[in-house]
């Protein structure tokens, strides 16, 4: 068996990336954003092709991400922020609801969304993970944007003339 294998493509040239950052836990979000922007640059994404917006907190990420996805101006989106456990049930609500919104937007629109919302127990944990998560989200966004483009169906009138992955020889089955 010799399967067709799509390898990860981390070339960000020509990609348009939208970033939504929650301002709650500002220091963490800023560290994530800086690392994310640096990594996008290393991957070849032009800074003019990146839009950054901020929202009050993690629960508001979904609204901004949805609007950006609906614009179809972006190849991928990135959500950044931090939810740090407190003494109430609020942590679970915010963590679960923000993650669900982010996933739903990606699935409903087909626009990849890298979820960089840290859910941690302490400020120290958030600080230790912020830069790494920001850079990771840049890589995820670029890879998934390229994968989505590679998996996009081609529009052609004569499918029998091309050599697409899904074309098989007619062996009478």
Curated annotation (Swiss-Prot):
GO terms for molecular function: 6,7-dimethyl-8-ribityllumazine synthase activity. Transmembrane segments: none annotated. One of its GO terms (cellular component) is riboflavin synthase complex. Pathway: Cofactor biosynthesis; riboflavin biosynthesis; riboflavin from 2-hydroxy-3-oxobutyl phosphate and 5-amino-6-(D-ribitylamino)uracil: step 1/2. One of its GO terms (biological process) is riboflavin biosynthetic process. Keywords: Riboflavin biosynthesis, Transferase. 5-amino-6-(D-ribitylamino)uracil binds at residues 24, 58-60, 82-84, 115. The keyword Transferase applies. The active site is at 90 (proton donor). NCBIfam families: lumazine-synth. This is 6,7-dimethyl-8-ribityllumazine synthase. The gene is ribH.
